Amino acid sequence: GDGWGQRAPYVAKLIQYHEFDIFGTQEGKHHQLEDLKAMMPEYEYIGVGRDDGAQGGEYAAIFYKPERFELLDSGNFWLSEDTTQPNKGWDAECIRVCTWGKFLDKLSGNTFVHFNLHMDHIGVVARAESAKLILEKIKAFPEKLPVMLSGDFNVDQLNESYLLLQNSGILSDAYTTADMVYANNGTFNAFQPDAMTEERIDHIFLSPEFKVKKYGILTDTYRSPADETDTV
C-alpha cells in the first residue's frame, strides 16, 4: 500500500542515504514531520500548519542539519492577498502557506534564505499571483542574500507561473543551470513508479550566487516515498 506507515521508513532512509543537508517538504502533516524527525534525529525542521498557523493542516516545512546550518531567523506567510493569516488567496481551492528560513552555513560562513512552498493545484490566478508574491518577498527582504526557492508548484516548465520565476532575473531553475542533470523522468508519478512524463512540477529555483553542480530527479526506491518524485 501507499499509506504513510509503509512509506515513512523509506522516506527517511532515502534522505539519510543521500545525506541531504537541507530540503523542503510539501503536504506533510504534523505527525508525519514528527515521525521523520524521530527517525532522523540529525535534522531539525521549521514550518507551521497552513490551516491555523500552528499544527493544523499541511506544512511546507524545511528540514536542515543544525550541525551544518545555524538558523538565524524564520517565518511563514500565506499565498494570498492577506499574507498574515490562514486564508485562501485569489481563486485557490486550498489555503496555501510558504515557510522561509535564514541560515548560516557553518562550513562556508555564507548566509542565505530558503523559501519553501506548495502552490495551489486548481487556481490558475492563484499560482501566477503566488509567483509574483514570492518575487516581491525576495525583493523586500531587508538584506540582499542568496535565495533558494523549493516547492511543489503544480505546474510544469512551460506554464506562466513557472516562467514568471524563471524569467524574473532573480531566480533560475536549477535544472537549467546545473553542470550535470540526472532526470530520466518528470516529477509526478501518482504512486506509479513506472509512469513516464516530461513534466516537472516540483522545482528548485536559485539566485545567481549558487553554483549548481548536480541536479537530480530521484527514482531509486521500490516503494514510492510520495506521489511526486524527489528533486535535488
For the regions a language model picked out, list residue spans one by one.
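Glycine-rich, highly charged phosphate/nucleotide-binding loops
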Residues: 2-14
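Active-site-proximal beta-strand/loop segments in catalytic clefts of secreted hydrolases
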Residues: 1, 26-29, 48-51, 65-66, ...
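Active-site beta-strand/loop signature of hydrolases that rely on acidic residues for catalysis
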Residues: 11-36, 63, 101, 111-117, ...
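Metal-dependent phosphoester/phosphodiester hydrolase catalytic core
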Residues: 93-95, 105-128, 132, 141
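Extracellular/periplasmic catalytic domains that process cell-envelope and extracellular macromolecules
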Residues: 16-17, 38-39, 53-56, 91-95, ...
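Structured beta-strand-rich core segments of catalytic domains in phosphoester-bond hydrolases
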Residues: 22-111, 214-218
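Metal-dependent phosphoester-hydrolase catalytic domains
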Residues: 125, 129, 138-147, 155-232
